[in-house]
Amino acid sequence: MEKNNKKRFVLVHGLCHGAWCWYKVKTHLEAVGHCVTAVDLAASGINMTRLEEIQTLKDYCKPLLELLNSLGSDDDKVILVAHSMGGIPAALASDIFPSKIATIVFLTAFMPDTRNLPAYVYQKLIRSVPQEGWLDTVFGTYGKHECPLEFALFGPKFMAKNLYQLSPVQDLELAKMLVRVNPIITNNLAGTRSFSEEGYGTVTRIYIVCGEDMAVPEDYQWWMIKNFPPKEVMEIKCADHMAMFSKPHKLCALLVEIACKYA
C-alpha cells in the first residue's frame, strides 16, 4: 500500500473488555496495509492498573491519552474507533488532542454531546434497564464513602443473551475467560464539566448502528444520533453488540471506507 493510502487506526474497547476483542479487525486492517493499535484502558486486558487506582475518567483513559500524546506533529492523524462505553474515553481523548484525530467512529458506542455531562448518555440508558435485565452481571462500589465510584463485571449469561447472541461461540468463550471488573463511567468518575465545542466538538464523528444490539438497543443508538448528529451514519443491520465478532468483514469494509473519505 502506498504511504498516502496507509491510515492509522486506534481501537478502543468497551466495558469489561480489552484490546483482545479487536483481534479480527486488527488482523484484517493490517492485512490490507493499515497501521492498527488496539489499546487496553486502565485495569483492562493486560493493563496492570488496579481498579482502586482509577479515581477519575482521565485515570481510566490514561493508556489512550499517553498513546496520543506520544504522536508527533509529523505523524498522521488517527482514526479513533470506539466501541460501546469506549465512546466516552474517545470523546475525552479528542477533547484533549483534537488536532491528532481525523475522525471518531462510534461503533454502537455511547456518543456524548457538548451540552450535558460526559456520563449523561450512559446513565440515561442504564437507568432505563430493570435490575433483572442485567441477569448475572455483578455491580459494586469502591473508593470514598462520600463520593463512591461504581464497577461492573458482565456475567456469562448476560454476555450470551445480550452481547454475543449472534457472534461465534468461540468468541463468547474467549470473552468469558478474559473480561475484567471495570469502572462504570458515572458523574463521580467523569466529573461535572462537559466536553468542549473547541475540542471534541471540532472532530468529525461517524456513527455505526448495529441493528441487533441487545445491550445498546437500536432505538437508543438513533436517539444519540439525533441528540448530537454526526457527519455520517452507517449501519450493520445483522450485527449484535459485538460487531467485531459477529460481522467483522462488514465492519472492516466500513472502516476502510471511512478511512478513504475522512482521513
Curated annotation (Swiss-Prot):
Pathway where it operates: Plant hormone biosynthesis
GO terms for MF: hydrolase activity, acting on ester bonds; methyl salicylate esterase activity
KW Chaperone (keyword) present: no
Q: Which Pfam families match?
A: Abhydrolase_6
A single GO BP term for this record reads:
salicylic acid metabolic process
**Reaction(s) catalysed by this chain's protein:** methyl salicylate + H2O = salicylate + methanol + H(+)
Which is a Gene Ontology cellular component entry for this protein? Answer: vacuole
Q: So where's the catalytic machinery, residue-wise?
A: S84 (acyl-ester intermediate), D213 (charge relay system), H241 (charge relay system)
Activity-regulation annotation: Esterase activity is down-regulated by salicylic acid (SA).
Q: Please name the top-level EC class of this enzyme.
A: hydrolase
Q: Give the protein's biological function.
A: Methylesterase shown to have carboxylesterase activity and methyl salicylate (MeSA) esterase activity in vitro.
Provide the family line: Belongs to the AB hydrolase superfamily. Methylesterase family.
Which PANTHER family does its entry note? METHYLESTERASE 3-RELATED (PTHR10992:SF1007), METHYLESTERASE FAMILY MEMBER (PTHR10992)
What is this protein identified as?
A: Methylesterase 4
